Amino acid sequence: MTTLTARPEAITFDPQQSALIVVDMQNAYATPGGYLDLAGFDVSTTRPVIANIQTAVTAARAAGMLIIWFQNGWDEQYVEAGGPGSPNFHKSNALKTMRKQPQLQGKLLAKGSWDYQLVDELVPQPGDIVLPKPRYSGFFNTPLDSILRSRGIRHLVFTGIATNVCVESTLRDGFFLEYFGVVLEDATHQAGPEFAQKAALFNIETFFGWVSDVETFCDALSSTSFARIA
């Protein structure tokens, strides 16, 4: 068992029955010229987040944690995004940006596009799971819950973008399904001003989960002895 120093208190978990979840580390969210950038959000400080996620993934994999990568987006015709009868049609900034700039149609968050791809620095490895998701929450219309329950996983460590949208949405839904959620704050980044990051972390540590950081997470894992299963 590993005890992780966190806010509002430490949390103990078995790494080999836990998952590290990397949320939407796609060009869309972390690279200049991607969807968030084109929609007017600041992505200029995402490089350190990418490096911190690399560090967390390496440590988690060595500890026997399952690594799950999410990619947010839809088919090339955006059928999966929903039409005017879906609130997603009206609230998705990617869809709104494409309606304002028709030349971007088919380029933002479309499966197979550069925008949809994970950033070059983050490469899933054999044994990892890569899941597409059509909405903010990674539990909606995906097999995430089944994947976790079938492996006896109850503790989820979150990284990725955006803290205040897809990360928080997935952690909240996990809370309602009886999962313990931890966010590594320096391995996440908000969509919007800095106060959005602070508000999301406040919500998580006060109501829905725990907040720690990459160095503390790696130190906790490295101080734990793991009995390897042959």
Swiss-Prot record:
Its EC number is 3.5.1.110. The keyword rRNA processing does not apply. It comes from the Bacteria. Induction: Up-regulated by the nitrogen regulatory protein C (NtrC also called GlnG) and repressed by RutR. Pfam families: Isochorismatase (PF00857). The gene is rutB. Coiled coil: none annotated. The keyword Hydrolase applies. This is Ureidoacrylate amidohydrolase RutB. InterPro entries: Isochorismatase-like_dom, Isochorismatase-like_hydrls, Isochorismatase-like_sf, RutB. One of its GO terms (biological process) is uracil catabolic process. Hydrolyzes ureidoacrylate to form aminoacrylate and carbamate. The carbamate hydrolyzes spontaneously, thereby releasing one of the nitrogen atoms of the pyrimidine ring as ammonia and one of its carbon atoms as CO2. The active site is at D24, K133, C166. It catalyses: (Z)-3-ureidoacrylate + H2O + H(+) = (Z)-3-aminoacrylate + NH4(+) + CO2; (Z)-3-ureidoacrylate + H2O = (Z)-3-aminoacrylate + carbamate + H(+); (Z)-2-methylureidoacrylate + H2O + H(+) = (Z)-2-methylaminoacrylate + NH4(+) + CO2. One of its GO terms (molecular function) is hydrolase activity, acting on carbon-nitrogen (but not peptide) bonds, in linear amides. Keywords: Hydrolase. It is an enzyme of class 3 (hydrolase). Belongs to the isochorismatase family. RutB subfamily.
